[in-house]
Amino acid sequence: MEQLVSRLEAVTNRLEAVASRGGGSTIKAAVDDDPAWFDDFKVFNAKFLSGFVNDTIALGGELEQMGKFVNEAFHCHLVLMEVAARHNRPSQTDLEGLLKPLSEAISKVQDFREKNRSSKQFNHLSAISEGLPFLGWVGVAPKPVLYIQQMEESAQFYTNKLLKEFRESDPKQANWATSFIQLLKGFAAYVKDHHQAGLMWNKEKSAATPAALAVSAHKPPVPPPPSGFAPPPPPPIQAPTVTHAVTGSHSSEDSRSQLFAQLSKGSEVTAGLKKVTDDMKTHKNPELRNQPPLKSSALDPRPYTPPNLKKFSAPVSKPAKKPALFQLQNKKWVIENQDGNTNLEISECNDKQTVYMYKCHASKVHINGKVNSIILDSCEKCVIEFTDVISTFEFTNCKACKVQIDGFAPTISIEKTDGAQVFINPKCLESQIVTAKSSEMNICVMKPDGDLTEYPLPEQFKTVWNPATSKFITTTMDLNL
């Protein structure tokens, strides 16, 4: 079996060499004017991408379904490359439409991984989920190779786990992990050779539109049932066509028959090649070295720099700003989403009501009377002034906020806040102040003569072991030192 596989691979390589030179070969592409970069991609796609799908499905379990999702993503990528080879660069709106099917196919892979976190093959699924977005290079410029390498590094985190786990116990799993990384490296080399500044388009053709996908798209080939690792398939002898179907002697059945006829010849497949004489060799014919280099294809335009698409998916619009709210709901004063409003006042209140201020910015609230409690949550640069509270005044998740207490508050709580200025009168010195995960906290005591005395609250603490009590003792660091 191994000898047969080796023989098929050798014949495949010879066929590829014949097809790439185009001389003396009976196999001819259905579309003659495809750029050279697309011909190279079709060979890579057939030999490596399709082979990886088959190897993935062969592992069974959740990878069987994952392989089908990967096959769908590779198919969308192939169709998009075909459109680029036969159309000019589209507008930004049309480009997003062309990228949408590929983006959705990649999302299916990532969603499937998230739904199977308890799977024994989670590292396999994660490697694919982290690495497969490399197909999004088609929307990245001007450095798509760097993008592919980043996806490779993300996938390698999980493939290294697989190698560590299965290198000795199950070489089949380890070989799969290695082959995936080699696939990513190989594709990065292909992009570096042909699309270094971004996806190439055919400048001599009309601009592409999403309708080109419908013309070009066909149902992805169904991968064969898993039966172990299969040898790489031979390169396609007929390029997929966008504008018309191939009929007559170029039909798929005839092409398949031609391929098997070539394979059956064995080593005689290269008998029809022309012999390379000394006058055709560069190192033996000085005149050839003096000639300017030939272009790979007349339809292979120079690289250009498309608009920078930092993200593969379409930009997401910012969430709409929520409306401001200031009203009494049952026994709760609700103040939300106020921005720059410094004239908020609660004049009619009682000791059974509470005040809740949420996500306000640069606003000020004055409370005339006694309430049960006051909470400032996720506010920034806000000021609140009140007379008395029965239970607690609280800062939570705030930034650079101030409070002035004209009367008394039994408890002042400051939690997850950066920047809190608390102005109190001498009657409030008996209040209990509780802080947690906060910084830049100051208590300012207002004297009868109008002066202020500022006391910073500690942010650093020191913990030491007390052998006498067999306990840890925590003390504050003196901020006045």
Curated annotation (Swiss-Prot):
GO BP, sorted A to Z: actin filament organization; cAMP-mediated signaling; cell morphogenesis
Topology relative to the lipid bilayer, per the entry, is:
Peripheral membrane protein
* Alphabetized Gene3D superfamilies for the sequence: 2.160.20.70, Adenylate cyclase-associated CAP, N-terminal domain (1.25.40.330)
Query: Which parts of this chain are annotated as the region Disordered?
Result: 216-257, 276-315
Basic and acidic residues: bias regions = 276-287
Sequence ranges of Polar residues compositional bias? 240-250
Q: Which GO terms describe its cellular component?
A: cytoplasm; plasma membrane
Which UniProt keywords are listed? Cell membrane, Membrane
- C-CAP/cofactor C-like domain: which residues? 319-457
**Where does this polypeptide localize?**
Cell membrane
Q: Which InterPro entries match?
A: Adenylate_cyclase-assoc_CAP (IPR001837), Adenylate_cyclase-assoc_CAP_C (IPR013912), Adenylate_cyclase-assoc_CAP_N (IPR013992), C-CAP_CF_C-like (IPR017901), CAP/MinC_C (IPR016098), CAP_C_sf (IPR036223), CAP_CS_C (IPR028417), CAP_CS_N (IPR018106)
**Which sequence ranges are marked TM in the entry?**
none
Q: What is its main location?
A: membrane
Where does the record place Pro residues bias? 220-238
PANTHER family associated with the record: ADENYLYL CYCLASE-ASSOCIATED PROTEIN
User: What family is reported?
Assistant: Belongs to the CAP family.
Know the name of this protein?
A: Adenylyl cyclase-associated protein
Query: Where does this protein come from, organism-wise?
Result: Hydra viridissima
